[in-house]
Amino acid sequence: MPKRILTGTVVSDKGDKTVVVKVERKVKHPLYGKIIRRSKKYHAHDEDNAIKAGETVRIEETKPISKLKTWKVLDKVETSTKAKAAEA
């Protein structure tokens, strides 16, 4: 079975070697047909503590690392202006 890969925005980087990634998806309401944004948060493993809040990253499903972490950060897709300002 292939590993799932998702793209999302980092909302928290406070944990040691852990980031919380918010993944949004769009679904159609079953009755009214309106497109609705749904989101889910995933705890992901960041070995080098290199990822900061506000950045867009890709995460990959992996074997359980801890109670909450079953995802790991693959790479950084883009850096937001908020994260750039925090670095300066």
From Swiss-Prot:
Entry superkingdom: Bacteria
Ubl conjugation listed as a keyword: no
GO annotation, cellular component aspect: cytosolic small ribosomal subunit
Keyword Coiled coil set for record: no
InterPro entries xrefs: NA-bd_OB-fold (IPR012340), Ribosomal_uS17 (IPR000266), Ribosomal_uS17_bact/chlr (IPR019984)
Pfam families listed in its UniProt record: Ribosomal_S17
A GO term for molecular function: rRNA binding
Signal peptide extent: none
UniProt entry keywords in alphabetical sequence: Ribonucleoprotein, Ribosomal protein, RNA-binding, rRNA-binding
GO biological process: translation
Subunit structure: Part of the 30S ribosomal subunit.
Function recorded in the entry: One of the primary rRNA binding proteins, it binds specifically to the 5'-end of 16S ribosomal RNA.
Family the UniProt entry places it in: Belongs to the universal ribosomal protein uS17 family.
HAMAP family assigned to the protein according to its UniProt record, in alphabetical order: Ribosomal_uS17_B
Protein name in the entry: Small ribosomal subunit protein uS17
Gene: rpsQ
